[in-house]
Amino acid sequence: MDRFYIIPNSAKDPELAFSGMIIAYLEQRGARCHVQPITEKMEGPYHYTDPDGIPEDTQCIIVLGGDGTLLQAARDVVHRDIPLIGINLGTLGFLAEVDKNSVYPALDRLLSDDYEVEERMMLEGKIYHGNDLIGKDIALNDIVIGREGHLRVIR
């Protein structure tokens, strides 16, 4: 694997210093990298990444941030069928499994095709009011149904 697209989290890598280190590391080893431009807020249905901006030959998307960044990126690029790997720049990550201190061995494994792709389930949830569809969205792994309204305490 040698063609990567990088999605940074501007709150966790504001100067793109960590992103730059990853790009330099990969490019020094012959890989090609493209970086998602950082914008205030994306227009339309995408929050981090417009999938149309990802080069067609991309083999892997590297998501820098945490679980939230990875979850949103998965939603944004769901129709592109490109594997994602999350690099955790925070304190604890369950989905973003690669810790920032062990990023280089993980990148080496990607470059040498020493990895397994783990398939994850994408779900679509729809909200109806009567027969009217009032909302829908997609999610990675699970959808939580909650109740909105007044908090009631029972004695």
Residue ranges and their predicted role:
Residues 1-65, 69-79:
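N-terminal glycine-/serine-/threonine-rich phosphate-binding loop
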Residues 49, 89-90, 138-140:
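Residue-level signal for pocket-adjacent positions within structured domains
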